[in-house]
Amino acid sequence: MIFSTLEHILTHISFSVVSIVITIHLITLLVDEIIGLYDSLEKGMMTTFFCITGLLMTRWIYLRYLPLSNLYESLIFLSWSFSIIHMVPYFKKYKNYLKAITAPSAIFTQGFATSGLLTEMHQSEILVPALQSHWLMMHVSMMVLGYAALLCGSLLSLALLVITFRKFISIFSKSNNFVNESFSLGEIQYVREKNNLLPNTSFLSSRNYYRFQLIQQLDLWSYRIISLGFIFLTIGILSGAVWANEAWGSYWNWDPKETWAFITWTLFSIYLHTRTNKNFESVNSAIVASMGFLIIWICYFGVNLLGIGLHSYGSFTLTSN
């Protein structure tokens, strides 16, 4: 009873704090002058991290195994992973380009985990024999950490694409306006020369220079965090294969979860390969990474929604009242 009450309190505190963090972040986007709000945002995410850590530890002590056996527990761990990713740049004294992604991701996963859809999973249950293994901690924790990092990297790539295409549309629009005005004067050759100089002129402006710097930083951070997530995902898949051999007598069975995990791994392998090719532009690799956002969610939720395959533990069904 005490553990259940403490878990309930920590869940609501963490959700409330991260909601306040989102509100503070929105205020800082509108009012840049309020510097004190930036510190409040970081302290809020630290509070969220410690609350979720306390929640996981409480459930671990109560259940006597790392709480990663169903969708509810893995979502809580995913939210915890987002909070860790948020704090790494802060302690490294880097400019945090991830905070616009990690904080909303934490609140959405936390909100879904505590929603009425997963109420039945809040209660403790005895693990099925296949899950009573030390590989549970290794395999599932690495997979969820990999999902969190890859999701953040994919969202950064999506942001890069949005900013890049907005820049191209803006330049194209200005170019067309200039061409129309120049054609009315009949200066065709002059238009061609000015048209070639237009991108350079736009680049030299302070606004476009800042945008260029932002694109470069988004590209760098997406590459870093996707590389980290790919390592976690690889370790998770390999440890899962060893566990599968112990539990089912085969390293790989091509059930839905394993198939989509392989698709996810292959997609991000392609992304990392494109990064080694200097002829490949950052936009092209960002397109590959952004595709991974959808693939990860299919891999993560697909089996739980369908409730099929060898990995259907902790699946849930949507029921109407």
From Swiss-Prot:
Coiled coil: none
Annotated localization: Plastid, Chloroplast thylakoid membrane
Transmembrane segments: 17-37, 46-63, 71-91, 98-118, 143-163, 225-245, 259-273, 286-306
InterPro entries attached to this UniProt entry: Cyt_c_assembly, Cyt_c_biogenesis_CcsA, Cyt_c_biogenesis_CcsA/CcmC
Keywords of this entry: Chloroplast, Cytochrome c-type biogenesis, Membrane, Plastid, Thylakoid, Transmembrane, Transmembrane helix
GO biological process assignments: cytochrome complex assembly
Keyword Cell wall biogenesis/degradation: no
Main location: plastid
Topology in the lipid bilayer: Multi-pass membrane protein
GO terms under cellular component: chloroplast thylakoid membrane; plasma membrane
GO molecular function, one term: heme binding
Protein's job: Required during biogenesis of c-type cytochromes (cytochrome c6 and cytochrome f) at the step of heme attachment.
UniProt-listed HAMAP family: CytC_CcsA
Family membership: Belongs to the CcmF/CycK/Ccl1/NrfE/CcsA family.
Subunit structure: May interact with Ccs1.
Name of this protein: Cytochrome c biogenesis protein CcsA
Gene assigned in the entry: ccsA
